[in-house]
Amino acid sequence: MNGALTVGTLDGANVEMHRVLGDENMFLFGLKTEEVAETRRNGYNPYRIYSRDPAIHAVLDQINKGFSDGVRYEDLHERLLFGNGGTPDEYMLLADFPSYCEAERRMVETYADRTKWNQMSLHNIARSGIFAADRSIADYAERIWKVPYKK
């Protein structure tokens, strides 16, 4: 990790990182596990979000138009809104977007405060030993792979 400050959702490896580093040393955003389940139960509809949120509408319209790089992004636009044979916005990106924008705002604000940014970075360096590759491999060898390893 080398002092990197994480911007991310509270899933996957970020759950363990959050447990070790705490809220104050990460920029978390997005729906929590129980909120994802509830949103799905209530009939998640990304097109409704697109229709009601001007910022998301503008972003997706720009994606649909492209970025003058010669690459066409209509498929991404269509998959997010309509699924194109799959689940629309399977990872609930549109639901997370406002929260992501807020996390980005907090990150930019924190970066402007060099002392605070450096304190957070140093904290993450000091607490990241548990995530070292050697420790992780030893843990996997013992708990998951059940193979001997040399200490």
Region roles according to the model:
Residues 1-121, 125-130, 135, 139-151:
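Catalytic binding pocket for nucleotide-activated donors in carbohydrate/polymer assembly enzymes
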